[in-house]
Every structure is written in C-alpha cells, then in structure tokens.
C-alpha cells in the first residue's frame, strides 16, 4: 500500500509493508489506570483511532491491541491511601477510561489485555531471558534485565549506553529493587513482594512471590496477541524512553523481531507545558463537555497532526465547535434535502475519495491536507444546496461524510447523531410544509453563522443572531450546538 508513517527509530518516513500481506498488527500502550482520564491521556487513543479507520478503509484487516496497566507502584500507593483494594481502584479507573474512549467515538480495540491477566506469559518471558543470558536474579526475589548484554540497546532513542545513568523511569525507582543490581542501568523484570503490600498484589514465581516490572507486560502481551513480529508499535512521545527502549530490548533479547515501525504522538500542552496532574493543569472530559459537545473535543484532538503538540487554550474548544457546527449544518441540510446516504454508500475506498484527501492521509496522516480536501467538497455541497441540485447534493453528502468518518467525525453517524449543530430545530416540523420551510431557511442562516464563527468573524455571527431575534427566532448555543426556537 502507499501509506507512509514517520518511524521514530529511523527518524524518517517509512512505507507500511505489512508483515502478513493484507493484515496490520498494531500495539498501542494504553492507560495506567491509577486515576481519572484527562484530555492529554486520550490523545493517543484518538490519533490511533484515525489510523485504524484509514487502514480499514484501505481494505486491510487490523488486529489492534491496547493494553491496560492495572497494577503498579502508583496504583498500590494511591489505593492504600484511600483505603480501597488495589484491584477495585484499578477497575474503577479502567471503567472511566473506557467511558471516555466511547464518549469520543474511539473504536474498541481487537483485544484490550490487562497486565494482571497475563502473569504466566510474563513469568515465561523472564525465564526465557534468564536462559538466554540477558537477565539475572539477585537472590532476594528480584530479577533484572542486563542492559549491557543487549548490543542494540539505545537504538530506538539514538542514545549510547555509556552516556546513560539509569534506564528506569523515576517513578519506578525504589531502594528495594536498586540494591540487587549488578549495573545501575539495569531495570527490573520482577519485583519481590514487599512487607505490608496486599497479598493479592503478588504472584508465585520461580524467584519468589512478586509482580512484574512495568516494561515487561507490553513485550509479553504483544507476543501473545501479535507474535514475534508485528507492524506498528505506538504510544505517547514521553514513552519512547525508557519504556519503549526497554520493551524493544526485552523482545529483541528474547529473539523476536518485535515492532517494524514506531509511531509516537505528541503531547497536549497548556501554556507550553505537558498536561499533567502533577502540574495541576489537566482537563477532564466531563469538565470539557459541560459547555461543548464531545464531538468538539474529538475535533480538537483529531484535526492537528499527531506529531504536533496541541496547545490547549481558551479558544481551542470554541474554535473546534465552530468548525464542527459548519460541517454538521451541511450534513443536516443535505439529509433534509435528499435523505441520508446508506452505510454502504459511505464506505468509499481511497481510490473513490478525492485524490487530495487520499494522498494526505497516506502521507503520515496529514490531517491538515485531508481537511483542506473536505472543505473543498463542503463548498461544492453548499453550492449544490443553493442550486437545488439533488444529485450533486447527494454526491457531496457522501463525499463529506465518508471523509469525516475516517477521522471519526461523521455528524450523522450514530455516535454523533444527537450532537449535531447548526440546524437543530427545537420544535418538531412534522409534515407541515410551512414549518419545514422555516426550518430550512433558519438552518441556512445558522450555517452562515457557523461559518462566521469558524472564521472568527464575531460581528457577522452576532448580526445573524440579532436578525433572527428580530424575526422572533431565539438562538441558543449549548453543548450540543446551536438550536433555535420561536418566541
């Protein structure tokens, strides 16, 4: 296929050449369910959702794995402080992540394995590494990976081992596991159970009771579901080191080819800083959707290139919502005029979509170029509506909706059917032709207003609202978009 993606390991665009022709295997590092999700957490899921939709639209079968880390030091510490069993704590926040994914229209993965559900696979991998001379036990129940034994260590992040002080994330370092290392740069594969920890938070192993290190689960579970070699490993850019570097080291040391391409998304930032609970600058989905539809949040996350940071500020959601309203208005009016396209009609192949859109998506998911192509078809659709050309209206509806569906943003899809904007009449028009005519006329003005808001032409947007008010039409901007009523 013609899709090229930026490979973090080689630092260049690489063609996607599936290991198994016609099939793409993807592993995405999912959530560590220690707390409620915020918009920064969800960017990876949304970015990879667009990739998966494009792969499927391109006729490829996709096996998509997104793991859940449901046990680690932070989960144990926070659950203990709250007086809640660690597993109940993890389940609570796993549910919150799932609800947030669904709220943003993210497709479910093929499998969503939990770390605690794959302890035997992780123990087997540790034993394999020990047998191959890449891991050792300290005799106190801890097992470490010998970084110096893996000659390509550092190749993912372009670092030299001799320049490294540690290969552990600061949050994973503790004195109990540091003491037994032969080399301070080695990292834990198995952590011995500590006094005072819940007995349910450890498992029997050849080295004593304990639990896996953070990096091990992804190597074990990607092998379990995707095999020795798969196509794409993804995650946030902050996971490149040490997590992904250590994953690669484990898997290569086990004798597996592992990931062919490494695809990393950038952060969501506020005032130039990564969105992080420790900085107190996070925004939950619940907070954001109090004033705006979830579709606007999805728009904000989907329409910036995945390798570019999203600077989240006061205008982010208003701008995204204005753009969403513009497209939603056209789709609603086109459906009113000629009816809704069938699901089958909307599944246009890349060859059937505008060439500019297909070329942009194949170019490392260039959403800016893809959206330019959608805007061009939107203009033609509005012309068709103005001219009353039913055939052209239907064709443009199919094109616009089919392209937006690749981004998970088809306004008439079941996901967003109740989150439309721009032409939602608050009164049923029924079969009354006068009410229907009024709905269409008001809808046309609200579409112009949505365009003005998208262009930040606030004066024109206010003038349209005021003109409608003078005619007895009240406009309300709510979280589900602009609605109107008489009175």
Predicted regions and their residues:
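Alpha-helical recognition segments enriched in aromatics with Gly/Pro capping
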Residues: 1-34, 49, 120-336
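N-terminal, positively charged nucleic-acid-binding surface of large information/translation enzymes
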Residues: 10-15, 19-107, 125, 484
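Alpha-helix C-terminal capping/helix-coil junction sites
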Residues: 56, 102, 130-131, 263, ...
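Short phosphate-binding/catalytic loops that engage adenosine nucleotides
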Residues: 60, 134, 473
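Short, glycine/charge-rich beta-strand/loop segments that flank catalytic centers
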Residues: 68-73, 95-97, 107-122, 140-149
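Structural preference for alpha-helix termini/caps and helix-kink/transition segments
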Residues: 274-275, 281-487
């Amino acid at each position: 296929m013609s899709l090229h993606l930026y490979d973090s390991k080689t630092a260049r665009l690489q063609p996607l050449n599936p290991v198994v022709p016609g099939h793409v295997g993807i592993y995405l590092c999912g959530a560590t369910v220690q707390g409620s999700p915020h918009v920064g957490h969800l960017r990876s899921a949304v970015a990879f959702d667009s990739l998966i939709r494009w792969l499927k639209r391109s006729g490829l079968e996709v096996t998509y794995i997104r793991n859940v880390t449901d046990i680690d030091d932070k989960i144990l510490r926070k659950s203990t402080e709250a007086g809640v069993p660690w597993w109940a704590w993890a389940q609570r926040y796993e549910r919150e992540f799932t609800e947030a994914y669904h709220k943003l229209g993210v497709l479910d993965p093929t499998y969503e394995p939990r770390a605690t559900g794959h302890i035997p696979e992780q123990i087997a991998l540790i034993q394999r590494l020990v047998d191959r001379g890449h891991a050792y036990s300290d005799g106190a129940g801890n097992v470490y990976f010998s970084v110096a034994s893996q000659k390509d260590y550092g190749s993912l992040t372009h670092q030299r081992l001799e320049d490294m002080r540690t290969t552990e994330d600061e949050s994973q370092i503790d004195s109990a596991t540091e003491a037994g290392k032969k080399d301070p740069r080695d990292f834990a594969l198995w952590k011995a159970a500590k006094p005072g920890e819940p007995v349910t938070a450890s498992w029997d192993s050849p080295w004593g009771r304990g639990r896996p290190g953070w990096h091990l689960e992804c190597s074990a579970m990607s092998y379990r579901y995707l095999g020795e070699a798969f196509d794409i490993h993804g995650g946030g850019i902050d996971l490149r080191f040490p997590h992904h570097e250590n994953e690669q080291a484990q898997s290569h040391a086990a004798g597996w080819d592992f990931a062919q391409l490494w695809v990393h998304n950038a952060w969501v930032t506020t005032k130039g800083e990564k969105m992080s609970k420790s900085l107190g600058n996070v925004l939950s989905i619940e907070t954001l959707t109090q004033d705006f539809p979830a579709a606007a949040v999805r728009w904000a996350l989907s329409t910036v290139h995945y390798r570019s940071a999203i600077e989240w500020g006061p205008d982010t959601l208003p701008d995204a919502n204005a753009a969403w309203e513009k497209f939603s208005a056209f789709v609603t009016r086109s459906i009113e005029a000629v009816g809704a396209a069938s699901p089958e009609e909307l599944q246009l192949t890349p060859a059937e979509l505008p060439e500019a859109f297909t070329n942009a998506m194949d170019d490392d998911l260039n959403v800016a170029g893809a959206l330019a192509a959608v805007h061009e078809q939107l203009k033609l659709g509005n012309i068709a509506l103005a001219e009353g050309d039913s055939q052209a209206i239907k064709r443009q509806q199919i094109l616009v909706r089919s392209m937006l569906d690749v981004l998970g943003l088809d306004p008439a899809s079941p996901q967003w059917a109740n989150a439309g904007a721009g032409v939602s009449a608050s009164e049923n028009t029924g079969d009354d032709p006068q009410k229907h005519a009024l709905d269409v006329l008001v809808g046309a003005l609200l579409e112009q207003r949505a365009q003005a808001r998208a262009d930040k032409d606030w004066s024109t947007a206010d003038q349209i609202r005021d003109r409608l008010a003078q005619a007895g039409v009240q406009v309300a901007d709510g979280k589900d978009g602009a609605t109107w009523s008489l009175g």
